[in-house]
């Protein structure tokens, strides 16, 4: 009898266990919702801010087990929200990109950092971020993006490229090269939207704006009929090491953020290697790995993330003892096809080494021979300058011009030319009255905005700025819109 009851109990236990397995199996067969957000994932796995610390907390790791990554180290101070971050682990600088210990950053920000299978979860200021280690996707509270550079990992200590950290936390950054300090403010988009205050500038009074407003009604009928494209290119972007360019890249990032907020695409004509032989300056990113060039690379990453299109503007944009951006590089000043090919390949090599995506080529000062053009076409689909091989007056101003050589590459003119320093009002008036049957294609030197951008620091040590509404660029954008140009990207032509 006892044996019988024992048998019954064993049978019931087996049925019970089988039932649990069937339930678990049935759950595993339920298809996952591929549209789940990070918030859904957090709720599904109970990864709320209260429970994150119960998982594998990577902020409490023993750093003594850290194995050096074998990358060039650098001493730099990182400030976030007014506080210097304290690092026990090295800061790395690889190919002019900084890498910081993500574990220590989260610890410094009083956050939590946990790992669950193939995902990292970060809780910063009660905001949850996740990094999928399988596909390098970062999920933020308000966006999702792919890592620019892979995380570096040693014994569950993760290093993140500063460009990716900035993109994730939406940082506004100020780079102090004299003291090697990067001063940051989290959630910059919430902070820098208040950019409407005027910067006093005696050279540009409101009468210029008033004149433009008076002409607005006159341009309305013309703009409604205009179907032409508009193109904006920021010219001669490079790292000069000159004192007058101290705030150059910060101002450029402010400009890029403004353009992105206005949903206006723009182009960056980048000079990869700046040379100034008279001052013995040669900023070659292939041979130099430093704070100054790192800010340039960071800025190019930032602009790419903010609706910018990057292209090569020659290699050094100079020859002989001339300074980059001022000197010529090709054409009648250097007609050699061998030199041209060598420099083009060096420019491409530099961009590839720095992992900067390139979408067009612009020859310096539009000076190039027909034979050099034929070589350029082998490397680039978009040649962002007029096709003058049959004469300057033969360049197509109304549309991109298909190459007669390879029937593939496109040459793009700039009929609106550029805005000359000291003649800003005259140039803007010329553009306002331009022939709208031509492309609204113009190039612009970012330094013209310096007088309209004021950089500040508040009482808590947060970097801030004001960007005047009556700036040259903002007036240019207004004119292009009022003339009806549809501002686009060369990659969409």
Regions found by a protein language model. Give the residues of each.
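Primary recognition of N-terminal secretory signal peptides and signal-anchoring hydrophobic helices
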Residues: 25-230
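Sec-dependent signal peptide recognition
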Residues: 2-10
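Metal-dependent polysaccharide deacetylase catalytic core of the NodB/CE4 family, i.e.
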Residues: 265-369, 439-442, 446, 455
């Amino acid at each position: 009898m006892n044996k019988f009851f024992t048998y019954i109990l064993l049978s019931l236990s087996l049925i019970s266990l089988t039932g649990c397995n069937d339930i678990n199996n049935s759950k595993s067969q339920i298809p996952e919702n591929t549209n789940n957000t990070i918030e859904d994932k957090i709720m599904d796995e109970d990864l709320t801010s209260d429970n994150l610390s119960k998982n594998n907390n990577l902020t409490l790791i023993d750093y003594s087990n850290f194995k050096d990554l074998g990358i060039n180290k650098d001493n730099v101070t990182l400030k976030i929200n007014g506080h210097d971050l304290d690092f026990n682990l090295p800061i790395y600088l690889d190919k002019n990109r900084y890498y910081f210990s993500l574990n220590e950053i989260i610890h410094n920000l009083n956050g939590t950092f946990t790992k669950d299978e193939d995902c990292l979860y970060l809780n910063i200021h009660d905001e949850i971020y996740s990094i999928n280690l399988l596909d390098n996707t970062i999920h933020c509270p308000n966006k999702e993006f792919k890592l620019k550079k892979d995380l570096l990992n040693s014994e569950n200590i993760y290093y993140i490229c500063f460009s990716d950290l900035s993109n994730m936390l939406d940082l506004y950054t100020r780079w102090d090269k004299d003291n090697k300090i990067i001063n940051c403010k989290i959630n910059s988009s919430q902070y820098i939207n208040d950019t409407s205050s005027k910067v006093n500038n005696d050279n540009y009074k409101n009468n210029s704006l008033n004149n433009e407003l008076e002409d607005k009604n006159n341009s309305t009928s013309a703009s409604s009929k205009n179907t032409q494209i508009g193109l904006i290119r920021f010219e001669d972007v490079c790292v000069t090491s000159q004192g007058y360019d101290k705030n150059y890249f910060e101002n450029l990032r402010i400009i890029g953020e403004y353009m992105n907020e206005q949903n206006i695409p723009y182009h960056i004509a980048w000079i990869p290697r700046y040379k100034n032989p008279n001052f013995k300056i040669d900023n070659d990113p292939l041979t130099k790995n430093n704070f100054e060039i790192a800010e340039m690379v960071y800025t190019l990453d930032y602009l790419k993330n903010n609706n910018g299109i990057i292209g090569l503007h020659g290699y050094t944009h100079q020859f002989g003892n001339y300074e980059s951006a001022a000197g010529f590089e090709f054409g009648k000043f250097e007609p050699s096809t061998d030199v041209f090919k060598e420099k083009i390949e060096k420019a491409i090599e530099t961009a590839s080494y720095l992992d900067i995506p390139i979408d067009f080529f612009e020859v310096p000062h539009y000076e190039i021979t027909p034979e050099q053009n034929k070589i350029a076409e082998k490397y680039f689909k978009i040649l962002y300058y007029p096709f003058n091989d049959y004469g300057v007056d033969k360049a197509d101003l109304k549309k991109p011009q298909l190459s007669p050589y390879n029937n593939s590459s496109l040459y793009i003119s700039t009929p609106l030319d550029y805005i000359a320093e000291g003649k800003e009002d005259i140039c803007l008036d010329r553009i306002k009255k331009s022939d709208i049957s031509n492309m609204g294609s113009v190039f612009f030197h970012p330094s013209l905005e310096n007088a309209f951008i004021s950089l500040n620091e508040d009482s808590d040590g947060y970097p801030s700025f004001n960007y005047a509404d009556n700036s040259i660029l903002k007036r240019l954008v207004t004119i292009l819109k009022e003339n009806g140009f549809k501002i686009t990207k060369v990659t969409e032509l």
